Structures are given as structure tokens and as C-alpha cells.
Amino acid sequence: MGLPRPVLWLRRLWVLLQVAVQVAVGKVFLKLFPARVKQHIVAMNGKNPHFSYDNWAPTLYSMQYFWFVLKVQWQRLEDRTEPGGLAPNCPVVRLSGQRCNIWDFMQGNRPLVLNFGSCTUPSFLFKFDQFKRLIEDFCSTADFLIIYIEEAHASDGWAFKNNVNIRTHQTLQDRLQAARLLLDRAPPCPVVVDTMRNQSSQFYAALPERLFVLQEGRILYKGKPGPWNYHPEEVRAVLEKLHS
């Protein structure tokens, strides 16, 4: 069950204040200590060396940054997942347009790996080949599902330079069209999209990207949210332990 609405709105207000203070302090530090801030950002950026400092650092603490971070933090207030708990059986849509649910992809006691993300999230694409190798190595003992959610860095939102150019999805067809771009990368597992109500993204607190392992309807592994804590290698460790 989610939070009662009055409690949810009070927490949203508190988060709003926290994010506003974070952005204000960030702007001050960026103004007073630009070299130190750049050093910190470059160190973080080492986790995705194919996406340079100049592509995204100038957008830090912008109004678009503020709204995106606020959206992510508000979404996490409605997280309905916990290790060992029941996995939300949210509706999703196949690329054919057929509607189904997440649990439809579970088979007996085989683990089901959920990979939430979008093409405009650099870390999701940067680690896509790593995720594909995971599928190839464990396809005989586990199932995999990519759930395409709202864009992390839409071109009309908190956009980065030299990134994939996709606007905010206004319709389900927009989302399906964006998800089909992943097919060029030949994913060896089904790809579905979140509904326009963003229920799976909301209940799994998946924005901007996140990994889960389900088994028999329950959450076996809950990865931390990306971009910095999105680690397919942790899923590998979980699957290896299951079948050791």
C-alpha cells in the first residue's frame, strides 16, 4: 500500500524544500569553487568515460535539473518494492501494442531480471552490451525483460549535448517509437514499455534506470537507482549465487 495522500503531500513538500536548497547551495559552490566542483564531477564521470564533462556539467543546477531531480525524488516516495516483498504486477505494453503485465514474463521459479531505462540515459546505453552478455550467460536459467520508461534526458527537458535526441513522450506511440530504437542494439530479450501513467516506473522507483531480480513473484534483488549506482555486475553475482 502507498502512503496516505495527506502524508504523501507533506513529504512531497519537504522534498521540494530539500531539492530547492540543494540547487541553491550547488549554484553557490559552482560560483565560488568552480575548480573543486569540476574535479568532483570529473571523478564521477569516470564511471561513464564515453560521456564527457562538457556534455552535461553545464546543465547542473539549471531549472531543468531542478524539475528532473524533484520528479525523481517524488517518485521514490511511492516506491512499493523491498527485498523479499511482493513485486508490483504493473501493466506494460509490448512493442506490438499488446497490453500485458510484468508477472506474465515469469516462468515457474526461474528468476526474472527487470532492466528499467531509456535511450536518453547515457549510463543505460553505456552498459547495454554488459547487460546483453548477462543475458547470453544466464538465458538457460533466468529470464530477462527490458522495460522502457519515460526519457531521463529528453531533448525538451534536462537535455545533454551529444546525446540521443528524443522528446518527452506525449502518447503511447511516442514511447513505443523510442523503445524501438533499442532494437538496433539487438537485445536478446523482450522489450516492453511502461504505460503513459508511468505506473511501473513509479512503483519500482525506476527513474532514470534501475535493475531488479524477481523470483516467484517476490523481489530477490533491488538495485540502487542510476546513473551512478546502476550495476549489471551485481545482477551477475546474484544469478551466479542462485545457480552455484
Curated annotation (Swiss-Prot):
Cytoplasmic side: 34-244
Subcellular location: Cell membrane; Endoplasmic reticulum membrane; Basolateral cell membrane
Topology within the bilayer: Single-pass type III membrane protein
Catalytic reaction(s) noted: 3,3',5-triiodo-L-thyronine + iodide + A + H(+) = L-thyroxine + AH2; 3,3',5'-triiodo-L-thyronine + iodide + A + H(+) = L-thyroxine + AH2; 3,3'-diiodo-L-thyronine + iodide + A + H(+) = 3,3',5'-triiodo-L-thyronine + AH2; 3,3'-diiodo-L-thyronine + iodide + A + H(+) = 3,3',5-triiodo-L-thyronine + AH2
Catalytic site: 121
Membrane-spanning segments: 13-33
UniProtKB keywords: Cell membrane, Endoplasmic reticulum, Membrane, Oxidoreductase, Selenocysteine, Thyroid hormones biosynthesis, Transmembrane, Transmembrane helix
InterPro entries linked: Iodothyronine_deiodinase, Iodothyronine_deiodinase_AS, Iodothyronine_deiodinase_I/III, Thioredoxin-like_sf
Pfam families to which the protein is assigned, alphabetical: T4_deiodinase
EC number: 1.21.99.3, 1.21.99.4
Molecular function terms from GO: thyroxine 5'-deiodinase activity; thyroxine 5-deiodinase activity
Extracellular side: 1-12
GO CC term (a single one): endoplasmic reticulum membrane
GO biological process, one term: amino acid metabolic process
Self-association and partners: Predominantly monomer. Can form homodimers but homodimerization is not essential for enzyme activity.
Assigned protein family: Belongs to the iodothyronine deiodinase family.
Primary role: Plays a crucial role in the metabolism of thyroid hormones (TH) and has specific roles in TH activation and inactivation by deiodination. Catalyzes the deiodination of L-thyroxine (T4) to 3,5,3'-triiodothyronine (T3) and 3',5'-diiodothyronine (3',5'-T2) to 3'-monoiodothyronine (3'-T1) via outer-ring deiodination (ORD). Catalyzes the deiodination of T4 to 3,3',5'-triiodothyronine (rT3), T3 to 3,3'-diiodothyronine (3,3'-T2), 3,5-diiodothyronine (3,5-T2) to 3-monoiodothyronine (3-T1) and 3,3'-T2 to 3-T1 via IRD. Catalyzes the deiodination of rT3 to 3,3'-T2 via ORD.
Listed name of the protein: Type I iodothyronine deiodinase
